[in-house]
A protein has these predicted regions:
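Active-site anion-handling motifs in enzyme catalytic cores
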Residues: 1-295
Length: 295
């Protein structure tokens, strides 16, 4: 109740404070604790930190959002794209997901599969690829991090209680990293409070096994060997978004392991399956400057 009142007050303050200013809106209506999706709110702020008026969706009224510019940056948010959208690295969750309307501008998309969807709808889309979450090391990299865990396990939030995850967690060499951030406190979002702590935990792992796309993307951005895993059939869109991302860095057949079937859980075997991915197909510094020029 109190939180709802505080959010409403924040909305009113945003209306008053930003009269006459050009604002852009980011994120979904609900507060998203999924680390990857939450970066869709936080990264635009990092990219625009000294300049402007970027407001989270939850802190503006519906009439503001529907009239203003919205940024679709991180995550499978193609279905949220409308005529007021600027697409900066967003992707599709499946080949069936379509934009609501032709966006105001497409700067980049997550990968070539997302681009194909825009082209199939008769919308021009540049062959500029990259999930902006890959840029996080340009804003923060832990110094003198100690590798405390042999394997970091990052299941997608729908896989948290999957049998394969529970079995892996019995291995003392495996450290579970929750892709869901702690609950928000007041008006400060979890991503503001914990984004560096999550990266610290990630970088303390020698390698990473993940069914979360952003678990893979962020580990690879920090040059940690990874293995894409499947623990269930519950992830919306199946392999589509993973292949979209991997094709953006010129990996056509990424290593993959299916834990729905019985697999050898020996630590050395699992470590041998992880590989260090080359993400140099995307010039991160140049990509950062491109997104900054838009915001």
């Amino acid at each position: 109740m109190l939180r709802g009142v505080l959010v409403w007050i924040r909305k009113v303050c945003n209306v008053c404070y930003n009269i006459g200013r050009h604002c852009v809106y980011v994120g979904q209506y609900t507060t998203n604790r999924n680390y990857g999706d939450a970066l869709g709110v936080w990264l635009p702020k990092l990219l625009n930190i000294n300049r402007g008026h970027i407001l989270p969706r939850r802190f503006v009224f519906d009439w503001q959002y529907t009239r203003g510019t919205n940024i679709q940056m991180v995550g499978s948010t193609l279905g949220d794209v409308d005529e007021h959208s600027i697409v900066c690295g967003a992707g599709a969750v499946s080949s069936e997901q379509l934009p609501k309307a032709k966006p105001a501008k497409i700067v980049s998309v997550r990968g070539p599969l997302t681009r194909d969807i825009f082209l199939s709808q008769g919308m021009d889309c540049p062959a500029v690829y990259g999930d902006p979450a890959m840029l996080l090391p340009l804003f923060y990299t832990p110094i003198n991090v100690k590798k405390r865990y042999k394997i970091g396990l990052i299941p997608h939030y729908v896989d948290k209680d999957a049998p394969g995850v529970r079995l892996l967690c019995q291995n003392p060499d495996i450290h579970l990293i929750d892709i869901l951030l702690p609950p928000n406190r007041g008006l400060q979002t979890s991503i503001e409070r914990y984004w560096k702590c999550w990266v610290d935990e990630l970088c303390a792992c020698e390698c990473v096994i993940s069914s979360s796309l952003h678990g893979l993307i962020l580990a690879e951005a920090y040059h940690i060997p990874t293995l894409w895993a499947t623990f269930s059939g519950n992830i919306n869109g199946g392999a589509f978004k993973y292949m979209d991302y991997y094709k953006s860095i010129n990996i056509i057949t990424p290593p993959h392991i299916n834990f729905c079937c019985k697999q050898d859980m020996d630590t050395s075997f699992l470590i041998e399956q992880t590989t260090l991915k080359d993400t140099s197909a995307i010039d991160k510094v140049r990509y950062k400057h491109l997104l900054e020029s838009v915001l």
